[in-house]
Amino acid sequence: MRNIRHYILLCILTGGFSIGAAAEEIIAIKADRIDTVTSGVIENGIIVIADGKIKAIGNDIEIPEAAEIIDVPDKTIFPGLVNPSSRIGLSQSARGGPASNPHYRVVDELYPHQDQYKRILGAGFTTLGLLPGEKGFVRYYPGYGYWPDSGPPSTGIAGQGAIVRPTGQNPEEMIVAESGFVMIHFQANDKVKNVITSALDSAKGKMSSTEPKVLPLVLALQGKVPTFVLCNSPGEILHLLKLLEPYNKMKLVLVEGNETYRVTKELVKRKIPVVLPAQIEFESNTRTRINVPRMLAEAEVKIAIRPEFDNVAGHEDFLRKIAELVKSGLNREIAKKAITIHPAEMLGIDYRLGSLDVGKDANLLILSGDPLDVGTTIDKVMIEGKIVHEAP
């Protein structure tokens, strides 16, 4: 004990402890309802936040004397929204292919001083999974955001996606994980398959390598980072699953497959989750409308839902679109998980984001009512315990 006291005194004298570390910033939020997403709803609850983390949550919580109290009667607290699949705020020219570019990092495109980020904060999004861009995959159209390019699609290994907060004075302040996942653009032809398997096999023989073109694939092969795959048709999905059978530790996430409901048995068997747009689809070659998120959820495929359009308007309209999916049959609790904890799990960051639990980042929304009621408004947005948006 004496040695510990001497060590602490030495740290204070030599600057080993910062002022921030010595004095915790403590906040206590009192609200009518706290929807944790993973542990139910707490009525008349309290959340205690210290240094950006949730320290306590419940009904009968002792509030520290030093805490700043935010009393929000008649309000609901909900986790910050997580969009796992976006290109918003990115405008660098796309790259060509088919090719293997695992060293390409989307963080090198980040520019934080954009009105788009401020506006999607106001829409409740506290975390984004940003995709590496490719010729034939996305192109920026002023006023509309990122849409599929009409040119020949690039395929292969697109690079490393980033996980970011949509706020910060510089790119470093935005980054949650600069190499959060590996992105593959898949097509079921021999050339694309050879590009992918050649890169993976090469990395498999260099598992201790730290080379920029190898390390991301090593981490993907080990399942230490997820692998997001853009795969458009049921047939392509079956080809993909067959191709990647030898690499069985990879954590696959399918992106954008509107017909994935046709291969649900294979997805359930492999425990592969899917990212879907918030929209009611038309069944192929018919005028029949179908709720694909509902169909996958009922088949016990884990889903995450992203905005229908990858622009500001799509993000601002997101909760209304989720409410429409629920009205059309999507289970309400699954819908809430599909916009919070499920995308966090797919990105591999559920240990710190996606729900309101002790130990996690205090990323939360203060709402006027239920998050899936059309009339609900977002009063405040917090990221790591700091208010980053307030409604006028």
Summary of predicted features, one role per range:
Residues 32-35, 43-45, 345, 357-392:
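C-terminal cap of metal-dependent C-N hydrolases
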Residues 32, 47, 52, 74, ...:
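Divalent metal-coordination and catalytic microenvironments
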Residues 34, 38-78:
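Histidine-rich, glycine-flanked metal-binding segment
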Residues 20-25:
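Boundary at the C-terminal end of the N-terminal hydrophobic targeting segment
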Residues 7-18:
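Bacterial N-terminal signal peptides
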Residues 121-238, 242-251:
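Polyanionic/metal-chelating signatures
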Residues 93-95, 100-104, 226, 268, ...:
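His/Asp/Glu-enriched, well-ordered alpha-helical/loop segment
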